[in-house]
A protein has these predicted regions:
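Local cysteine-cluster metal-coordination motifs and their immediate loop/turn environment
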Residues: 44-59
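N-terminal [4Fe-4S]-dependent radical SAM core
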Residues: 1-42, 90-91
Length: 414
């Protein structure tokens, strides 16, 4: 999963080149962090077989009739990571997420090289969760066995639906039969598998939504991600909106999903995430708890904490530009020191997605700001019935989860 990143309130400063200017980030600043948050690594593979009309991620259709420039891109990823090392020196990496795009376009040898480079350059935890996204249209049994042997230990499969008509409407390259076959292959080699599905699809009925979810539940995978389809700006669907279920039907779908997944033994622990006991996505939990993540690859975002500041980075988005810049020692297009006034909203934007919320102490631990900096907002949200009144936690109520945007906006400074 790509992290939720708020739109910056000001134009970013010119990016320092990699870790050459690490001294800039160690100078005194507006905040005081007691310790570094946990660190994750996000790796972006930008190519897809075809761009989906609803997708606003940094993904690019692979050149027709040609292979992706795998070797050159892996060279660039290693160069990018090497340039970033001074910013994270000595910090253990707890999770890795290889997203896209479609990372399963990488060959078995390419994935093995990528993971070998990561292990050679970073102190990866022995039990690190290493997730790879995969598209059912790119599944080959032998290749996925090799991915597992290389060290991938969690697979996230972009199913979206098992209904052929809905898959066609979404512009997916696979059908329902391919989706089922992909899950069968995955479960032969992986015991930690997430299925991505969407609901409130074009022309979808409640009965069809139920059928999709029941099919997913029948596989008893460790994790499900169930997303309400939204029309994102700068997508084909935004320009040519399809006919979607009305709000009442979408809410009925959501209520049924929550009840049915709970009945099946899945815990709804985050806005769109459902897990069997102790099988939550550790990488995504680090995002939602406002942990740190180094992002490498075309268009990848990163958040890194220092004693007196929080740094956000973004790599060059176009794959060709990214590869050129990374090999020249300057993969980072934008970098900025997050203003202390923005940190409360950034923290809450993520933490309030969690059903259990977070310990109140985590606000200071991960923003470097005292909790009383948001006392008025906490009081207002509590008075509105959107936050649990327990002062030891920051936890949304059932009403707060239902009206999450309203709850988050309370913490948005004008």
């Amino acid at each position: 999963m790509i992290p939720i990143v708020p739109v910056p309130g000001a134009a970013p400063a010119p990016a320092p080149s990699g870790g050459d200017n690490v001294g800039l980030w160690l100078k005194p600043g507006q905040i005081s962090l007691p310790a570094s948050p946990p660190l994750s690594l996000y790796v972006h593979v930008p190519w897809c077989v075809r761009k989906c009309p609803y997708c606003d991620f940094n993904s690019h259709a692979a050149p027709d009739g040609s292979e992706i420039p795998e070797a050159a891109y892996l060279d660039a990823l290693r160069a990018d990571l090497e340039q970033s090392l001074p910013l994270v020196w000595g910090r253990p990496v707890h999770t890795v997420f290889i997203g896209g795009g479609t990372p399963s376009l990488l060959s078995a040898a390419g994935m093995d090289r990528l993971l070998s480079d990561i292990r050679a350059l970073l102190p990866l935890d022995a039990d690190a969760e290493i997730t790879m996204e995969a598209n059912p249209g790119t599944f080959e049994a032998e290749r996925f066995a090799s991915y597992r042997a290389s060290g991938i230990n969690r697979l996230s499969i972009g199913i979206q639906s098992f209904n052929d008509e809905h898959l066609q409407a979404l512009g997916r390259i696979h059908g329902g039969a391919e989706a089922r076959a992909a899950i069968d292959i995955a479960l032969r080699h992986f015991d930690n598998v997430n299925l991505d599905l969407m609901y409130a699809l074009p022309q979808q009925t409640l009965a069809q939504c139920r059928q999709d979810v029941e099919t997913a539940l029948s596989y008893r995978t460790s994790h499900l991600s169930l997303y309400h389809l939204t029309l994102e700006p700068n997508t084909l669907f935004a320009r040519f909106p399809p006919a979607l279920p009305d709000d009442d039907t979408a809410y009925e779908m959501q209520d049924w999903i929550e009840a049915r997944t709970a009945e099946a033994g899945y815990r709804h622990y985050e806005t769109s995430a459902y897990a069997q006991p102790h099988r939550e996505a550790r990488h995504n939990l680090n995002y939602w708890r406002f942990g740190d993540y180094l992002g490498i690859g075309a268009g990848a975002h990163g958040k890194l904490s220092f004693p007196h500041r929080v740094l956000r980075q973004m790599r060059y988005k176009h794959p060709a530009t990214y590869m050129t810049q990374a090999m020249a020692g300057n993969a980072v297009q934008e970098a900025r020191d997050v203003d202390a006034a923005e940190l409360p909203f950034e923290f809450m934007l993520n933490a309030l997605r969690l059903t259990d919320g977070v310990p109140a102490s985590l606000f200071h631990d991960h923003t470097g700001l005292p909790l009383h900096a948001i006392r008025r907002e906490l009081a207002l949200a509590t008075d509105k019935g959107l936050l649990d009144p327990d002062p030891s936690v920051i936890r949304p109520t059932e009403l707060g989860r239902r009206f999450l945007n309203d709850l988050q906006e309370i913490f948005l400074k004008s």
